[in-house]
């Protein structure tokens, strides 16, 4: 759902509500009726501190060799959420190439673009100029803020922060993306309707919690617990 620079998305990782004007967002576990709220710019630090707390609790009574193993895993996560230096961004040459290929996706004509990083094809995007989102969503700001909370996997965070990549939002809304691992994300349906402001707010019976508690619930769900209450919806 998108309206007045508010965005709501739901998936396997939970429910996200983004407020571009306040540069804040909400991450909710609806089955547990809990949520975390914070600023885009503070998420990486908050995530790091929460994960550090959880790992510390988990490893405190483990043998030394297992502590080393988990600390190594933790360091890899730290690296994924560490903001790269400007020199790292500048060292990557990002080039956007337009093509003459078009395709209808969810009823909208979409043009294919290719993203090359240091001469290597890293991503393909199908972008539609036919969806009138400009009055409801600042696409460039949304893309930049989303980059603040996404992990830096295989250099994605770096090139997605380049001016050439962010300027691609001027071409329209991304209807399909395929990365260099073949992972595809695609829009399957577009509807235009008036959305109540309350749809972008947490219900009164939801409890605000720390990010560490929300992560614990996510880890419980991914560990294979079969109960509905302990899994992400």
Task: Describe each model-derived feature in a short phrase.
Residues 1-233:
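Extended soluble regions of mature proteins
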